[in-house]
């Protein structure tokens, strides 16, 4: 089912761990969505934050070619990955657990866009119990320079300079034409992820971790998304780390980062549990 051709990692909490405030039958599941070009071991330090809290952790990163090429062409290439990822929760029989997403950069954000659409439209995926989402260095809105920098980081380790230059130039031209110049027309066929998520109907809390020093994702794009949610009175928390670079907030501020993620996780699960109890046992007068 969900694990067919999906390159993911899942870690279950240690049975010996005691003292966590979770229902032992419904321990939280945290799903990490890596940035474009991310390796599984890069996510290990983030996974440890939640694993040490007694959570089940799933790590998945979409293929960089899908993130930078097919999605730029307006093809919904990540939608099937999103569906398979959510189906894993049923495969492992943890579909009743509270779920938190931790989304990195636009690579994770693109995949999350399809996840949200499926959660609101596809049965039985719409039965899953999402309680919160954390965004790290996301989202960005049609930032050509930032996208080129991100792709350059990926290609730098595996291609020569001449090929990399040609690939980056072709990518930049493609994005400028399809996602900027022709976007007033192409958006009717494939709305970009940023615009689509500005209308996200999800009411669970969201936490945005970003930095004004990020050279790839503009803090103005992040703050515009934050403002859009707050105008709709949706629960939104933020932290501007100020000096850290792209997806480097944990590396620069490990204690602060861990504390806010842990606090957000616990708060989301607690509020969701209270809400569920009230719905199951309504007070009558």
From Swiss-Prot:
Keyword Transmembrane helix carried by entry: yes
Primary role: Ensures normal bone formation, through the negative regulation of bone morphogenetic protein (BMP) signaling in osteoblast lineage cells by blocking cytoplasm-nucleus translocation of phosphorylated SMAD proteins.
Name of encoding gene: tmem53-a
Annotated TM spans: 165-185
Protein name: Transmembrane protein 53-A
Family annotation (PANTHER family): TRANSMEMBRANE PROTEIN 53 (PTHR12265:SF30)
UniProt keyword annotations, A-Z: Developmental protein, Membrane, Nucleus, Transmembrane, Transmembrane helix
Subcellular location: Nucleus outer membrane
Pfam families on file: DUF829
Organism: Xenopus laevis (African clawed frog)
Membrane topology: Single-pass membrane protein
UniProt keyword Cell wall biogenesis/degradation, yes or no: no
Stated family: Belongs to the TMEM53 family.
Chief location category: nucleus
GO BP: negative regulation of BMP signaling pathway; negative regulation of ossification; negative regulation of osteoblast differentiation; regulation of nucleocytoplasmic transport
